[in-house]
Every structure is written in structure tokens, then in C-alpha cells.
Amino acid sequence: MKRKLVFATNNAHKLEEIAAILGDKVELLSLNDIDCHTDIPETAETLEGNALLKSSFIYRNYQLDCFADDTGLEVEALNGAPGVYSARYAEGEGHDAQANMRKLLHELEGKENRKAQFRTAISLILDGKEYLFEGVIKGEIIKEKRGDSGFGYDPIFKPEGYEQTFAELGNETKNKISHRALAVQKLCEFLQR
């Protein structure tokens, strides 16, 4: 029998991406599947902290094995920003990916160093014990958006070793090499022990 795991997110893009990466290794449940309609606040100062806030909330309130993630884009020339604030970087714009990209590109105007990395932290709670997993992919921020697939900063992030952005690579390739894929692979390896 497959292990049931709740993925603590309301982000449909993340849910789809994680489901594709996990395949049939676990029975993945969404927050809707467990009738959780709470917007779990992400108030921690670190990616790991936000992931733990979400997974702890689900475990505490539903007593179900679960995991949550938080992802940040860390740009070297901006001292790691937007980091934990990546989804809401353009203040006052909510979770507006276009506004976030515009702000980031504006802040990088005239800067030579465009090195960046995407980092995902996953907090897993199994039988009340917490485990952390991390995935990192290095790359650079290009000057103009390219590509139509993916979400968030994908049109301006070009991973090391590729000429295409995440948005140009397409989901199949991205789901093999991304920061989230690397973190989920570690999660899968742990679950298969």
C-alpha cells in the first residue's frame, strides 16, 4: 500500500509539478483533499522556517503525515534577495509574477553579476518527526523574459549548463533538473528507505 502524504500548498502549479516528480511513489493529497481551506501564513525569516510552519500546521491540526516547501530565488548581486520574499517581491502587488520579474530586472539594470540560484527547502513530518531536504540549482538572471512554460521567475532564470530559461526548457526537462526536483528526489530517497 502506498504511503499517503499531504502536500501543504494552495499553489496549483507547485502541486502539479510535485505530482509529476513524485509519480506513483506516494499517494499525494492536496489541502483540498483534506478539506483544509486555511491560508497558512509564511511569516518565518527563512525558507526552512516557512516550510516547517506549513507542515507543522497540517500535522498539528489534521494528524496526517505531510510535507511543505518554500522556494526562493537568491541573486548574488542583491545579497541573496529576493530570497524568502520571492513570491511577494513587488510589494503591494500580492503574488504577481510579472511585477516581481519587472522589479528584479529593474534592480539588476547595469549590474554585471547576474549569478543566481533557486533554492527549495522541504519540511517533512512523518509520525511526528521532522525532516528537512534542500535542492539548489545555480544559474543566472537574463535581461529579458524568454519562454512560455513554467511559472514565477522561470522566463528570466537560465540554469547553469543550459542556453534556455526554465520557461523555454519545458516542464519535462525542468522537472528533472530544478531545485524543487532535486529536493523532492531527496524526499523520495528518504521515503524509500
From Swiss-Prot:
Listed cofactors: Mg(2+)
Top-rank taxon: Bacteria
UniProt keyword Zinc-finger present: no
EC number: 3.6.1.66
Record-listed substrate binding positions: 9-14, 71, 151-154, 174, 179-180
GO molecular-function terms, A-Z: dITP diphosphatase activity; ITP diphosphatase activity; metal ion binding; nucleoside triphosphate diphosphatase activity; nucleotide binding; ribonucleoside triphosphate phosphatase activity; XTP diphosphatase activity
Listed SUPFAM superfamilies: ITPase-like (SSF52972)
GO biological process: nucleoside triphosphate catabolic process; nucleotide metabolic process; purine nucleoside triphosphate catabolic process
UniProt cofactor note: Binds 1 Mg(2+) ion per subunit.
Binding site for Mg(2+): 70
Active site annotation, chain numbering: 70
Reactions the enzyme catalyzes: XTP + H2O = XMP + diphosphate + H(+); dITP + H2O = dIMP + diphosphate + H(+); ITP + H2O = IMP + diphosphate + H(+)
GO cellular component entries: cytoplasm; cytosol
InterPro entries: dITP/XTP_pyrophosphatase, ITPase-like_fam, RdgB/HAM1
Claim: Nucleus is one of the keywords in the record: no
Keywords, alphabetical: Hydrolase, Magnesium, Metal-binding, Nucleotide metabolism, Nucleotide-binding
Function: Pyrophosphatase that catalyzes the hydrolysis of nucleoside triphosphates to their monophosphate derivatives, with a high preference for the non-canonical purine nucleotides XTP (xanthosine triphosphate), dITP (deoxyinosine triphosphate) and ITP. Seems to function as a house-cleaning enzyme that removes non-canonical purine nucleotides from the nucleotide pool, thus preventing their incorporation into DNA/RNA and avoiding chromosomal lesions.
Recorded family membership: Belongs to the HAM1 NTPase family.
Subunit structure: Homodimer.
Name recorded for this polypeptide: dITP/XTP pyrophosphatase
Source organism per UniProt: Bacteroides thetaiotaomicron (strain ATCC 29148 / DSM 2079 / JCM 5827 / CCUG 10774 / NCTC 10582 / VPI-5482 / E50)
